[in-house]
Every structure is written in structure tokens, then in C-alpha cells.
Amino acid sequence: MHSKELQTISAAVARKAVPNTMVIRLKRDEEDGEMTLEERQAQCKAIEYSNSVFGMIADVANDIGSIPVIGEVVGIVTAPIAIVSHITSAGLDIASTALDCDDIPFDEIKEILEERFNEIDRKLDKNTAALEEVSKLVSKTFVTVEKTRNEMNENFKLVLETIESKEIKSIVFKINDFKKFFEKERQRIKGLPKDRYVAKLLEQKGILGSLKEVREPSGNSLSSALNELLDKNNNYAIPKVVDDNKAFQALYALFYGTQTYAAVMFFLLEQHSYLADYYYQKGDDVNFNAEFNNVAIIFDDFKSSLTGGDDGLIDNVIEVLNTVKALPFIKNADSKLYRELVTRTKALETLKNQIKTTDLPLIDDIPETLSQVNFPNDENQLPTPIGNWVDGVEVRYAVQYESKGMYSKFSEWSEPFTVQGNACPTIKVRVDPKKRNRLIFRKFNSGKPQFAGTMTHSQTNFKDIHRDLYDAALNINKLKAVDEATTLIEKGADIEAKFDNDRSAMHAVAYRGNNKIALRFLLKNQSIDIELKDKNGFTPLHIAAEAGQAGFVKLLINHGADVNAKTSKTNLTPLHLATRSGFSKTVRNLLESPNIKVNEKEDDGFTPLHTAVMSTYMVVDALLNHPDIDKNAQSTSGLTPFHLAIINESQEVAESLVESNADLNIQDVNHMAPIHFAASMGSIKMLRYLISIKDKVSINSVTENNNWTPLHFAIYFKKEDAAKELLKQDDINLTIVADGNLTVLHLAVSTGQINIIKELLKRGSNIEEKTGEGYTSLHIAAMRKEPEIAVVLIENGADIEARSADNLTPLHSAAKIGRKSTVLYLLEKGADIGAKTADGSTALHLAVSGRKMKTVETLLNKGANLKEYDNNKYLPIHKAIINDDLDMVRLFLEKDPSLKDDETEEGRTSIMLIVQKLLLELYNYFINNYAETLDEEALFNRLDEQGKLELAYIFHNKEGDAKEAVKPTILVTIKLMEYCLKKLREESGAPEGSFDSPSSKQCISTFSEDEMFRRTLPEIVKETNSRYLPLKGFSRSLNKFLPSLKFAESKNSYRSENFVSNIDSNGALLLLDVFIRKFTNEKYNLTGKEAVPYLEAKASSLRIASKFEELLTEVKGIPAGELINMAEVSSNIHKAIASGKPVSKVLCSYLDTFSELNSQQMEELVNTYLSTKPSVITSASADYQKLPNLLTATCLEPERMAQLIDVHQKMFLR
């Protein structure tokens, strides 16, 4: 950055406002533009600053169980704050925040919650569900299928990113295209309001129609893609060799595609069931029958294609998996994809059985069309007009079967019957031999069908009069309702007959508040159940309270109605419903009952006072005047009524609570007091109100769990106006530090709020205060994408060479993240470009490790030393080699060609790293692909095509074609590796061909240790990381082998005795480390650098002790528990792990105790096995013959590997 550019930044920072976007972008790196949530997640993961925000977003709505009761406002406010509480409870990672890895995507959360509200609305509105049992069954299996698919998503993405085979790439991408369409369309409709949701489902070329085509075997359908992968003529999904990545990718795509296929079936069933219920609720029998048919047909079709006959998709996939599992070489498979599929085979078989044995809970029989409808002409006749019964109208009837929650389609409508003088006919229906109920529906003229009533299986006669009483009770004309109800009841109408949502005439009367009907007819009948509940557990008192029928509420209470009755699903009382609706008179009538329990809680712990807060202050005042009211009641989430008043920004309600002496400082389960919510929301109105009552509320109130103040929250949530309002207060305390020693200045810097930063500095915030990690504000600013923040801090005296706990300077922070502009600015201001971290890394090392090319170029242009070693004796170019970053390697060699000079230490180290990477590739190939017949030339070409030899080509020193020059050495190395491994497997016999006998014996004797290791611990060999241990044996063998074959020249001696010295039982520690990790799939702390939590340490110690016992038992031949107190072993291991001390010392002490051999004898044994002329060790008993073989696999010190450098580099440079 030139001085002119620096002046531009300084000038921009000096302005009162933040510089405009265009100016800022000139200073920021290209990669610092706006990123999607997924892009930001990937960046944070890549630089090891991932946080829990990303994983929580998708589940956030699930934490807001009280949405239907308390409302959308509370949900949208509390959800993101709950996320922050989770993040900060374990200590905020300030570096993660500085990189925007903790940014709370409020818009995304709001969108998710709005979708959730719409879903809830749809469910609450679903009063009648004819296919409810179908929905339950489908949803349960759908959730399982989707869980499996979601768990497989990451690896399926990996397949898409790494697939190279053109043959299967188009097929796999076809599966992915369908998957993306499926998920995108589902997401598009998920949160729509009910009417739009249905409209999208019914689109002629919409999602349902498109998904039905998934079964079509042609074109770009999912079915055609899966059939291509299953085609036995190609066998794409069956590996030919153990590392046939193409086949494993095809196999994984096949499995994933099958799960998607099943998911489509369940999604279609779920949506068509919803449509069937939608039409049922609307009384649209024609479309209900059509959707009923759709559900049955879809299930039958998909069931057949997935599990039918000998050609079911799932059967075919399982057959392929079983074929692969039976391959002779598959036990050595090193494919993560394959291992996962093996674990999921059982799940696929379970899914197959579920589908195959499932019968949809539908009644296939269709009732007969009604034909016997009689209008009485006796004393029971009911003259017209009454209700819908008017002379001249036509009435038709239809029937539907119902049994245990299962339904049939509607029957055909009967012939029309014309009403003439009489109403309410009697219907005759035959007894159902299958003992199912018959639901009777009626339709006047061409109007909407109505549910008329239920006939039990044994009933043959049904008088159509009960629905008319229910309709009369709902009549808005109360006088007419009384007259009609009187007549209908006299003629036999059943007051308790249930209709919509299982509501009776009593519920209907309560809804309308028709006291006259209730007094004159219903309540005089002592047998009437006034506690009768509808489908959701609402009694007539609930209905009246929610409708604000104050007089009817009083009438019911006077006649003994339970004033504290609770609904079945949410435990709401009538008082909850009345307060939520804001009906103050109804609330007062309820409160007058001597039996009222004013503090009853619903499912989420909210009392009527909580719900009242979300309505009006008059209702709140009525409750507060009750002597038993709990003003400080807390919900399950710890929210008080005052919390809700602040969240709802209702100052009148807040004032009422303050006047009633409510506690204003109670903290919820996330340790948030009301003032913390006000600050987090950025509510200036409520903040000013709370500040105005400082005698009751402290503006410096801290959370109990992490010591955050309101100012911390306002800054973290980027509520600048709220932060400024707090900073106006003379008594604001800027010295309070949160957990992790976080100041408000740290947070302001980490969230990039330059105006707040300036204000804090004006108010005297300590610019050099350090976080728990030792970061100053300048360290954090160096991580931010805005270089002007660093400018402000430095201009205010920030220490440019401040050190963190890891000895990082701000320059290190900027370089590691790749903040090129900030790096340049810091260097211009005198930052030490050669400063080292605790591990000896310079800024250049860190930039290289982070693959930040532009920053590396900047540092090199500013004079960074590219020959500076870190504590591991690595130069920056070595980091690039380890990363396989070819462009970075070339950049360094352009700057200094001597870096590949084999006569220099740095050149030899580079070549050693390259050789080790190549040897690892070869070892993995041969150890896993012994069934393949590729010759050296073909293998060389494969390595070349895969780019595995590019580094070797780059480091070739001679003129001419690097590939052709390096090729002979690679071919010899391949041949050598192949030969030694062949001899290893044979375990005996003399070498043939051009290899001389002594050298081949060395090869065999050296590799025999690895074979012993394999036989003794076979489980380890199956795991990926076991390759590292045998690789060391190969490297030693190669070094001893090459001189005798005259492959290279060297001044050093490579005899076995030069490699072995001071061997004792500690030599087994590396083996034990690998052994333990492979059995537990965990990496243990054998070096004692950090402590481990108690439960983790306990579990780990038990596993280590168990495997250690197995190892010692194998060596001795008798149970180790008979010789050693294993409980004591486990206890000592646990103490070591928990305290962070080396486990190695514990293991070693017991190994010494267990062994009868002293250190000298162990050394003799090891040398014997490596010697070309074995001698007899008389002191060794037969019981210990296995031990040296185990020890020799790991006993050599890692530093001795450095002696391989000379030979390895000569291989590539000759």
C-alpha cells in the first residue's frame, strides 16, 4: 500500500460517518465482498474458526414452542438471542466473531420463524382430518428417511466435488439436479400461508406433478439415473480394485439416490393426504375422493417400484452392496464412502421391510348409495320452513365409512329428494358386517356438503335433525335461534351430538353467547355435560372466554363450570384465552370466581399474566389487582411478564408492572434481564424508559453466566443507536469485562463498528486490554476485513507489536486470515515482519499455511525472509509443499531458485517432504491394490494423471523434460516397493532376479515387523491412519536397500546398527498410541499438553485400559489381569488424562513391570531382528518372542528419519 493510499484511508476514518462502500472496497481484499451464509461457513471452517451459529439456524424455530400462545414478536426476538446465549455460555471466540463467523443472520431467522408460524397456522386450522392416520404413518417414516439423507449430504457433496470419471459424472449430476429441484421446491412452499400453499400444490405443472414423473424410466428422471448405475452391463457401482474411487462414488450416489427416491414417495403421500384433508374440511367430496385415490395409487406404484417382485429398486441396491462386500479385496478398502454405506445397509433393509409390510390406513370399500329417505307424516313430522329446510329445495345424501381413525371415500350422492312441507327425514341404512361407523353427509341443492351425523355399525335408522340444532345454536339471530332450537329439541335433536372439530350445540351456544338458549333449554337438563370437550380439549367455557362472551362466561361459572379447565394440547385455561384476546370484562368475570387459579401455567410455563402482557394494559391491571397474582412468574424459558412487556415494547404495561412492584431484574434461563433484551433488540424507546428508572434497573447489570452488560449486547447485535444511548449515560461502566476477559471495545472491534469504537476510545476504553487468548483490540482489528479499524486504533496509540498468549502480533493475525491491506498498513507503520509466534512461525509461514497467495506476495515484496525456519525446522516453502500448493511453491522458487538446491539443508528438506508424500501414495496403492495388475509404467501414468508427481517435476534440477528425467527413478521405486511387499506377504523364500540375497533378507526382515503388527492387531490395518506406522518401516527398508543395489550414492552408512540404539520399553509407545486411537476412533493426548474434561477422561481411560490389557495378554499369553491390577491401571490412566499429564509414562511403567527383559536385553532383541546375521539371545524366553516384533515396528526415534534425506533426494536428482 502506497503512502497516498494510506492517507486516503486515514482521511476516510477521520470522518464522522463510516466511509462509503465504494471507498472501503478499494482497501479491502477481493475475497472480502458480501458472502452467503454457506460461503461464510466454509471460510470459517477452513480457517478453523467455525462456530455453532451455522448448525443452530436450521433448528432455531424448534426452541420457540410457545409461538401459538405468546406470538410472533416474542419468537423473532428470543430466537437469535437464545443462539447467542448458547455461543457465549461456553465463552465467546472473539476471533470467530471478528471473522463474522458468529454473525446472527436475523433476516434468515425471521424467515424461518415466519415459515414456522404459517406451518402452525395450517395445523391449527386443520379441524377435521380424514386422513390423519395416513399423515401420521407417512410423516414418521419420512422423518427417518430424511434424517438418513441429511446425514449423507456432506459426503454426497464430496462425491460431486471430486468425481472425475466422465462415464458416471453425468449420471451422478442427474441425481444431484433432481435432488436440488426436490429440495428447492419443497423449501419454496414450506412456509407459505394456507391458501397459497394449496395453490402451489395444485399447479398444473407444479411440484406434485413433476415429482410423480420420478418413476418414469426415461429422460432425466431420477429413476433413469438409478437404473443406469444399476445396469449390469456396466457395473459402475462395483469396484474392480480396492481403490476404485469411481465405483465407490457411483455406489454412494446410488444409495443416496435411492433414499431420495423413497423421500419423494413419502413427500407425495404427505402432500396428497394434506390436500385430501383440506377438501374434506371444505366439504368438497369430489376432490376429496380424487386425492384419496391419489394417495392410494402413489403408495401402490412407489411400493411396487421400490420393493416389488424381483426387480424392486431397494432390492437391487442391496444386491449391489452385497456383491461389493463379497469381493476378496474389499476388506482392505480405504474408502470413507464405502464404510459409511456398510453401516447404512441395515437401515436400507429396514426401510424396505417398512414399505413392504405397510398397508395404508385407508378403507378401500365404498359405501352403497343411499336410497331410503323417508319424511314422516305422523306426530314426529317437523313442518317447514326451519333452518335449511324450505319447500322446493332438493336434498341429497352420501355416506362414508369410518373405523379407528381410518376413512373410506364418499359414496355416490343419492338421488335428490324434494322438500315439501316436512323437514328432517329419517334415513335407513343396512347394518355394516365389518362393524364400521357410517358418517352421513347432506347437501341442499348444489350447496356445500354438511356432516349430518354418525351411525354406529349396528344402527339402521338415522333421523337427520341433530345438525339443524347445531346450526341453530350458531345463528347470529339469537331470537330466531331460540325458536328453532326449541322446536328441534322437542322433536328429538341431540344436544350433545358432535360436528365440526367435535363441537356440540353447547359449544356453538357458547361461541354465540346465547344465554336464552342456554337458560331455557340446555341448563335445565341436569344430564347435559357442560364440561364436554371438543377435539382440542376446549370446553364451552373456553369457547366463550376466547370469544369474549362475558355474560355467558358468568352464566357457566354460576352453573358449576370448571373455571380452571385445561385444553388437551396446550394446557390453556379459559383465563389464558380471555387475557390473550384482550377481553377485560370477560377477564373480570373469570377473576370473580372464588375457585379461579390465576397463576396456572400452560405447556410452556406462561401464566395468564404473561398472555395479558401481549394484549392490553387494562387486562394487565385487572390481573394485577387480584390478591393471588404472581407478578414475577417465570415461564419454562425463564421469561417474566416484565420481560414480555419490554420485548413487546409496551411501555404502558411495563409501567403497570413497575407500579405493582414487580421485580425488574430477574434473568431468564439464558441469564438475560429485561434490560439486556431491550439492548439486544435495539429498542431505544424501552431503553430510555429503563434508564429513566435507574433506581430500579441498573444499566450496568451483568448476566450471571458470562458477565455481559446491556452495552455488550447492544454492540454484539450491532444496535448502534442503542449502544450510543447507553454511552450517553455518565454512569456507564466501560471497565466491566465479560467471560474471556472481553471488553466492549473488543466486541465493537470484532463486529466492525467504527463509530462505536471511536466513541469508546473517547470515553477512555483501555486499548491494550487483552482477551483470554491474549488478543488486544488491534489483534482483533487485524482479522477484520476493514483496514480502517486498525488505522483508528494505531492512531489512538495501539501497540503494533503486542503479543497474544501464542506470541502472535497483529501482523500475524492479519497474515493468517489473509487481510492483505491490513498487512500492508501494519508494515508501513513499522510492524516487525520477522516476528515469530510461539511455534516459531513468521507472518509468512502463517500466510502460506492459510493459502493466502496475495498476502504472501505482499510479504515477499516487503522483504519477508523466505529462508526463516520455524521450530519444526520448516521454511515457508515447506508449508506450501505440505499443502500441495503448487502455485505457492513456484512463487518461492521464482523468488529464490536455491530453495530446491539439493546441496542445501532447505533443499534437502523440501525433497524429503516430496519423497515422503510419494512413498505414502505408493504404499497406499500397493497395500490396498494387490489384486490389480497395473505394471510400473501404468502406475506411473496414473500418478502423473492424478497430479501426484507435479512437485517432483518442479524440483527436478536438470535441463530437459522433467517428467522423462524423473520417470526412471519413480519406476525403480515402484518396483522396489512392489518387490518388498510381495516378499512380506510370502513371509518366506529367497528373492529372485536382480536383487542380491543380503539386501533382500534385509527387506524381508525389516518388513516382517509390519506383518507381525498386522497379524497381532488386524483391526488397526483396516483403518486409514494405520498406513503411517508401516510407512516408517518401508522408509528404513528403502534406505538400507538402495545402497546395496547402487541406486544412489551417499557418504553415509545405512547399516541397521546405525539406526538402533537405547531401545527399551518406551519404544512401544508409538505403537500403543496408534493402537488405542484405532480401536477408539479418537486421538489421545499422549504428550500431556492439555487437560481433558472428567467424563471424557473417564471414558477414554476405560477404553485405553481395556485395549492395553488385550495387548499385554497377547504378549504374555495369559490374562494380564492375573499379573497386574487393571483397576489401578485404569485409575492412573484417568488421572493422567484428566490432569493433562503424559499417558506414556503410565503405560511405560506397567510395560516395564510386566516385562522380564531389561532395556539392554530388549535392545539385543531388536538388533537381532534387524541384523543380517541373527544371533541367539539366550536370556529371552519363548513367552517374549512376540514382544520384539511389536516393538521394532515403532521403536525408532522420529528424528532418525532425517537420515533418509540424502538417499531420497538423490533418487530425484540423478
Swiss-Prot record:
One of its GO terms (biological process) is exocytosis. It is found in: Secreted; Target cell membrane. ANK repeats lie at residues 464-497, 501-532, 536-565, 570-600, 604-633, 637-666, 670-699, 706-734, 740-769, 773-802, 806-835, 839-868, 872-901, 906-936, 966-994. Residues 64-89 are annotated as: Helix H2 is the probable transmembrane region of the tetrameric pore inserted in the target cell membrane. Residues 1020-1214 form a propeptide. Homotetramer in membrane. This is Delta-latroinsectotoxin-Lt1a. It comes from Latrodectus tredecimguttatus.
